Amino acid sequence: MSRIPITKEGEIILKERLTKLKFVDRPQISEAIAEARAHGDLKENAEYHAAKEQQGLTEAKINELEHALANAQVIDVRELPKTGKVVFGATIKLYNLDSDESISYRIVGNLESDPANGMISIDTPIGRGLIGKSIGDEVSIETPSGKLNFEIEEVEHI
């Protein structure tokens, strides 16, 4: 199986989520199940069934995070050579040539992608279109919503 790229910061966030699920959420759900059981007949006990469903969802999320972390290739961006080129983990400031606006993105793996917060996956059209480009390059990227034209203003490895 191929390794999934993730930044060092992304690994820390996923480990924190996993810890919370295992040591906060899981015990709370177990308590809720025990409390619901104490109410008697389980066939008609909505609290019990809701808690059991939540338990299943939580266990699935725990398994998903454990699998993701086991298959992650952690990349510390600060250790990469500073070439001025866009690489995995780099933070890029772009100037949109069409709208005259600047925007910043960080190129990350699928596990930590959060476009609303400027974290875009290396596997997206924008991510793929920027990799290997340098400061000053103008790039034209086809996206599902149309063509985007950018100039790369800054590339940081932070």
Predicted ranges, named:
Residues 75-151, 156:
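Non-DNA-binding regulatory cores of transcription-related proteins
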Residues 59-73:
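Amphipathic alpha-helical coiled-coil segments
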